[in-house]
Swiss-Prot record:
Name of the featured protein: 3,4-dihydroxy-2-butanone 4-phosphate synthase
Any Gene Ontology CC annotation: cytosol
Required cofactor(s): Mg(2+); Mn(2+)
Cited Gene3D superfamilies: DHBP synthase, GTP cyclohydrolase II
GO biological process, one term: riboflavin biosynthetic process
Its EC number(s): 4.1.99.12
First-tier enzyme category under EC: lyase
Coiled-coil ranges per UniProt: none
Record-marked site positions (Essential for catalytic activity): 126, 164
Function: Catalyzes the conversion of D-ribulose 5-phosphate to formate and 3,4-dihydroxy-2-butanone 4-phosphate.
Keyword Nucleus set for record: no
Reactions accelerated catalytically: D-ribulose 5-phosphate = (2S)-2-hydroxy-3-oxobutyl phosphate + formate + H(+)
Length: 365
């Protein structure tokens, strides 16, 4: 079955219809029904509950969550993909038990209204808001961000309603079942990767602001500076030699850490900045990408205590989904396409939307 284009999906969202969006097979490998929150009716919620069977959630921007006074459900997110659930909600007026399709639609309408305020909703309730990462799918390739992107691109408030599609036996529907579901119900279907690629053509959240040579004790690198227009963070790319799209590039994506990087504190199982730069210098070409993040005094103090504690077992590689988008945009700008990644194997979502592919993982030596 041929997938629909992003323009086709946007048009259906604009008409108040649902679409199906799939993510990567190496992530959740699921498909969600998605529609703009402003367009939700009772029959839409009923369709989701009856036919899709997943959890009905309401993605919205950080700004809307703050305006509605919605704190995160937990302060320390332990979920595998960093999905930011807030406390559940109910419309303050116009509902009875809150669980009926009509009541849930009313709750969505109350929270999605352009002039909605905290007094319009109460907690707990039967709708589960999700806080989207600023920058949308260019920052985090999840259904939460995709729903906000599609609603915004269709001319609505950047807020949606999503529901995972499940099979009759309760298992998650994968691509073959999702395509059959879409055909049966006349719903257009696409991928998050295609949405990312579409947005990259029309908009970006990271821009190159400076470039200069850098003579270090580990080699002669080229230093390129980028700024994230959403978060305001500054990221640095150290390149050596020629980057060729047709050939795999040696790449290290490194979250800047003032203690470990400057004091050269060893962390078992992870590439240090020095080791990564040395590896690239020995290879004669490659990219070391340094992702910068603002760190407060309390965070720094907690980090010092963590380093001072007893050595922990070698950590497993994990993905910080909020930084994958910025890093992917930068690598794409540098001309990287295929990567030999200095990292233990980890899962990414929809990096194919950035025209990137990991062909080999190189764990820390």
């Amino acid at each position: 079955m041929a997938l629909n284009t992003i323009d086709e999906l946007i048009e259906d969202i604009r008409q108040g219809k649902m679409v199906i969006l799939m993510d990567d097979e190496d992530r959740e490998n699921e498909g969600d029904l998605i529609m703009a929150a402003e367009c939700v009716r009772t029959e839409d919620i009923n369709f989701m509950v009856k036919h899709a069977r997943g959890l009905v959630c309401m993605p919205m921007t950080r700004e809307r969550c703050e305006r509605l006074g919605l704190p995160l459900m937990v302060q320390r997110n332990g979920s595998g993909f960093g999905t930011k659930f807030t406390v559940s909600i109910e419309a303050a007026e116009g509902v009875t038990t809150g669980i009926s399709a009509a009541d849930r639609a009313r709750t969505v309408q109350a929270a999605a209204a352009k002039n909605a305020v905290a007094a319009d909703i109460v907690s707990p309730g039967h709708i589960f808001p999700l806080m989207a990462q600023p920058g949308g799918t260019l920052a985090r390739a999840g259904h939460t961000e995709a729903a906000c992107d599609l609603a915004r691109m269709a001319g609505f408030e950047p807020s949606g309603v999503i529901c995972e599609v499940m099979n009759d036996d309760g298992s998650m529907a994968r691509r073959p079942e999702l395509e059959a579901f879409a055909a049966e119900h006349g719903i257009k279907i696409g991928t998050i990767a295609d949405l990312i690629h579409y947005r990259l053509i029309h908009e970006r959240t990271v821009e190159r602001i400076a470039e200069q040579p850098l003579d270090s004790e580990l080699g002669h690198f080229n230093l390129i500076t980028y700024r994230d227009s959403v978060e305001g963070d500054v990221h640095l790319a150290l390149t050596l030699g020629k980057v060729c799209a047709e050939e795999p590039t040696l790449v290290r994506v490194h979250n800047m850490d003032p203690l470990r990087d400057l004091l050269q504190v060893n962390q078992p199982g992870r590439w240090s900045l020095r080791a990564a730069m040395t590896k690239v210098a020995e290879a004669g070409s490659g990219v070391v990408l340094l992702l910068g993040h603002q760190i407060g005094g309390d965070d720094l103090l907690a980090h010092v205590r963590e380093i001072a504690s007893a050595p922990a077992p070698a950590p497993k590689a994990t993905t910080t989904y909020s930084t994958v988008g910025a890093g992917s945009q930068i690598l794409r700008d540098l001309g990287v396409r295929k990567m030999r990644l200095l990292s233990a194997p980890m899962r990414f979502n929809a990096i194919s939307g950035f025209d990137l592919e990991v062909v080999e993982y190189l764990p820390a030596e």
